[in-house]
């Protein structure tokens, strides 16, 4: 086990490095409890995450398992049926891209997703098709996509499991052709009795493709716990360098290292 000491002034909570000895952690807790601490550094960085790629068979099987608990075999069987029903393109592919000559088709499919996917609004379609085009990365078959026929037929006649799979493929097309997710990462360093404590936070600046992922998750997925939205990680404002945190409350916590798998 190892220990950490956290300090809080009621708004901002900062935490120490890992401390190996419980006695040492307890001493630090006593030393800082009720005293004042000072903000020594505030570091802000702009970060970005690019949209995901389209699905090949392996990545789709992995995601169908993560979101719906389907086995790889079950996903393949359903994809095969959807392919025979002309609802999806060829499933046994190892490419996550499409070819240059498909640009117009893919653009049309992406734009049609607003009517096809019940959880999407028209403002969420960005259509950055160039992101998913790469002739060199398509050998025999391109990435898995919904078909024009699927959009014409709609999902009315499908089982709920096949619907899930088709919606997963559709939303991935919208994500992959979407905007980057931009956020500001802030790290606040605080000193108390010559010991350093830190707090890290994230503030979304542009949700980009993540907006689609969250809409899909809320609509389809019962698993609400896996990825909490980032706004929970927002730090309180007003903590600039030199600010004093008066009469902080210090607490010690115990942590356990996970055994090797």
Question: Language-model features: where?
Answer:
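Core catalytic DNA strand-manipulation module of type IA topoisomerases
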Residues: 1-261
């Amino acid at each position: 086990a190892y220990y950490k000491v956290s300090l809080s002034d009621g708004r901002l909570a900062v935490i120490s490095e890992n401390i190996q000895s419980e006695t040492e952690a307890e001493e630090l807790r006593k030393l800082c409890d009720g005293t004042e601490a000072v903000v020594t550094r505030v570091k802000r960085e702009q970060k970005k995450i690019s949209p995901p790629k389209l699905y090949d068979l392996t990545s789709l099987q992995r995601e169908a398992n993560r979101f719906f608990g389907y086995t790889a075999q079950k996903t393949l069987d359903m994809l095969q049926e959807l392919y025979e029903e002309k609802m999806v393109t060829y499933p046994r592919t190892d490419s996550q891209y499409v070819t240059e000559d498909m640009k117009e088709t893919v653009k049309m499919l992406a734009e049609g997703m607003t009517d096809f996917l019940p959880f999407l609004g028209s403002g969420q379609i960005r259509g950055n098709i160039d992101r998913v085009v790469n002739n060199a990365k398509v050998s025999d078959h391109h990435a898995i996509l919904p078909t024009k026929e699927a959009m014409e037929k709609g999902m009315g006649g499908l089982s709920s499991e096949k619907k899930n799979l088709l919606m997963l493929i559709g939303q991935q097309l919208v994500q992959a052709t979407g905007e980057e997710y931009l956020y500001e990462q802030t790290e606040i360093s605080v000193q108390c009795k010559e010991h350093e404590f830190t707090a890290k936070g994230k503030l979304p600046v542009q949700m980009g493709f993540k907006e689609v992922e969250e809409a899909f998750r809320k609509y389809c997925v019962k698993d609400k716990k896996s990825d909490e939205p980032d706004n929970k990680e927002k730090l309180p404002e007003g903590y600039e360098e030199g600010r004093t945190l008066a009469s902080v409350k210090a607490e010690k916590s115990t942590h356990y290292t996970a055994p090797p798998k």
